[in-house]
Amino acid sequence: MNFIKSVLFVAVLILIFPLLPLVAGEQEQDINIIEEKVPVSNEIIDEESAKPQPESEEEEMVFPRSMTFLDVSEITPVDIKESPADDSKSIGIVYGKLMHVDVIQNLENGYSEISTWDYRSMRDIRGFVPTKLLKTVELNKKYGIVVALSQQKVYIYEDNALIKTFLCSSGLDDNNYFTPKGLYRIGERGESFFSPKYGQGAYYWVRFNNNYLFHSVPFDENRNIIEEEAAKLGQKASHGCIRLAIEDALWLYNNIPQGTPVIIKD
């Protein structure tokens, strides 16, 4: 009986043994197919760079077509009156030609109520000026400038499209040296200036509101660039003006015409 069981066991082994390589081969083939579907790569994928990057909000800009200002010279102050009368006290001053003022109402007595900011105190004020001093003009349509204080950058536009970006230094936040926000227009210019008060000067100045200028990084009394001040581009550092690298100040000086709108914002 035991002999018969042994013979049957050997017979079964003989029948199934040739099938073992076939089973193993199919399993190996399946593994190879899976490996081909998921190739191994040594390339590291930067998930952030793979995401679509948003376009700069500054790539296009629509500028105002006109602005209203006080029609006196760029360096002449106008008193803003507390009430619409010649003998009313002054509550502030505004310089002419380059700074936008908002007209609230025109009165019958020859005065107009305006909203603006006081050049001395840097505070927003609301008062009265002679209506005859108000003038509205069209702004230059070819170029436009935006100063972004939070970014410390100057954006130059041609036909509302961004063409240049300059790193800048605007006014410090303390001691009333900050650069005031608002709408201005480009005025007169000069090759250089020197301020004995601050012991500094600069090249290629372009006015946008009385003593507020675009100009190069400052130089000392010997007309040498002050390197520690030049190194501050990209952060607030000036007495209110907009400092630029020398080559950028020169480009603006040579290319941006009078009457070009300037928007200074956060």
Task: For the regions a language model picked out, list residue spans one by one.
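Gly/Pro-biased beta-strand-loop elements
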Residues: 131-225
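Intrinsically disordered, low-complexity Ser/Thr-rich linker and spacer segments
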Residues: 61-63, 67-68, 84, 132-143
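Exported/periplasmic cell-wall-interacting domains
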Residues: 25-40, 53, 140, 181, ...
